[in-house]
Design a protein with these regions (language model features):
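Amphipathic alpha-helices of TPR/Sel1-like and other helical repeat/solenoid scaffolds
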Residues: 1-2, 9, 16, 20-40, ...
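Single-residue signature of alpha-solenoid repeat helices
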Residues: 26, 66, 106, 146, ...
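C-terminal non-catalytic interaction modules
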Residues: 13, 276, 280-369, 373-375, ...
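Inward-facing hydrophobic residues that define packing positions of alpha-helical scaffold repeats
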Residues: 10, 30, 50, 70, ...
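Tandem amphipathic alpha-helical repeat scaffolds
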Residues: 7-22, 45-61, 85-101, 125-141, ...
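Amphipathic alpha-helical segments of tetratricopeptide repeats
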Residues: 34-35, 71-82, 111-122, 151-161, ...
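Eukaryotic tandem repeat interaction scaffolds
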Residues: 171, 178-290
Length: 411
């Protein structure tokens, strides 16, 4: 039913790269081809090669390089009059914005990318952009709003036999069930995702599915050793492909498994390691979750209750500000578990303020998809105005706080 997984973001002369190519190889080959295309004045090829370069930088956590690359890819696509290539560049930029915690900016860029994908007749970039919008909502905990979109995208991916996109959708739906307490349903979905990914030779998707299975085996069954074994298997793929972000999340999950088993010194070590990795790559969500695990471990090891309460209260405020609903709920559960009162209760209905990434890099809001003119030319003009405004603002400086907006490394 499913063919071998492929990477549609590797285009033009780079279609020989596979979904399992190491990011270092993608960056080297992409940069070489990009330079050749620029020297030859081949705008279409420059846009395509530039997209691969942008994605490699993004997944390696190199925010400034990724920021420059997606904008350059967009400009090359615009100069070539290639609306679909413009959409791919905006998809890359929107994904980068989401990973930096700039959720509103991410939604605008991804929404525009989906529209241009439809205008340009590229159903793949449209699907990827809609998936990006769905993932943005899921990360923020808005399950009701994006659950149906996940199901719709899963149905479309199954119908087309797209293994990679099917695996992504299954894992997203599984994670929502996991976070809602439906462990059995989540396990079945992660198991199916792992099976499809393995058959399609999608090592990245397989590693994420194994991580999800390990989480449930630990939380539901209390089977620590099996969970650690699944994480070890996933880590092999992460290291082989230099998947820094997936590896950091693997280490954080290993900390979760050890914490649940009461092995607090080991959990502290893993959370500390993951925290350093997330800070190095600028992944604010992973950084916050690692801090939470570390705080809980230190509390179990005898840390002063007042210090624990202060740390949890700070995390609650930060997560409230950047709009990560599920993570805020996790902090509240930790406060209850450890018997500490929140210094300042979080307000669930508070509207998140702009993150530093949004304040420093936000583009003027493009018109909603339904309000845009229906011609490719007008859509291209709208995209051009939005992307060019964005391109005038450099990426924000990295910081080391939870809300620091260096690029995250995503899937």
């Amino acid at each position: 039913m499913y063919g071998k997984a492929f990477a549609p973001e590797y285009q033009g002369a780079l279609t020989t790269l596979s979904v399992n190519s190491s990011l270092d190889d993608v960056l080297a080959v992409g940069t070489e081809r990009l330079r050749a295309a620029e020297q030859a004045g081949e705008h279409v090829e420059a846009a395509r090669s530039g997209l691969a370069v942008a994605e490699a930088h993004r997944r390696l956590g190199q925010v400034r390089e990724a920021d420059r690359a997606w904008k350059a890819s967009y400009r090359a696509a615009r100069d070539a009059g290639d609306v679909a290539a413009m959409a791919w560049a905006l998809w890359s930029g929107g994904t980068l914005a989401r990973q930096r915690g700039a959720f509103r900016l991410a939604r605008r860029l991804l929404g525009l990318a989906a529209e241009l994908g439809e205008q340009g007749g590229d159903i793949v970039v449209r699907g990827y952009s809609l998936a990006g919008l769905a993932e943005t909502g899921r990360i923020q905990g808005d399950y009701e709003a994006v659950g149906r979109l996940h199901e719709q995208l899963l149905a479309e991916a199954r119908r087309r036999g797209e293994a990679r996109h099917t695996v992504w959708a299954l894992e997203g739906i599984a994670q929502m069930h996991r976070n809602s307490g439906a462990h059995d349903t989540a396990y079945a979905l992660f198991e199916e995702a792992a099976r499809i990914a393995e058959g399609a030779e999608d090592r990245r998707g397989h590693a994420w599915a194994l991580r999800g299975l390990a989480d449930i085996v630990s939380a539901r069954d209390g089977d620590t050793e099996r969970a650690l074994g699944l994480l070890t298997e996933a880590e092999e793929s992460c290291r082989a492909m230099n998947l820094s972000g997936a590896l950091a999340y693997n280490h954080k999950m290993r900390g979760n498994v050890l914490y649940r088993a009461g092995r607090y010194p080991e959990a502290r070590q893993l959370y500390t390691q993951a925290l350093g990795e997330f800070r190095a790559m600028g992944e604010p969500r992973g950084e916050a979750l690692s801090r939470l695990g570390l705080t809980k471990s230190l509390a179990r090891l005898g840390r002063d209750r007042a210090e624990t309460a202060a740390e949890l209260a700070e995390l609650a405020r930060e997560l409230e500000r950047i709009g990560l609903r599920h993570a805020r709920e996790m902090v509240a559960r930790a406060q209850n578990e450890l018997g500490v009162e929140p210094a300042t209760p979080a307000t669930a209905t508070q509207t998140p303020t702009s993150t530093p990434a949004e304040a420093g890099a936000e583009a003027p809001a493009p018109a909603p998809a339904q309000a845009q003119a229906s011609t490719p030319a007008s859509a291209s003009a709208s995209a051009s105005a939005s992307a060019e405004a964005q391109a005038q603002t450099p990426a924000p400086e990295p910081t080391t706080t939870v809300s620091g907006e260096r690029a995250a490394v995503a899937r």
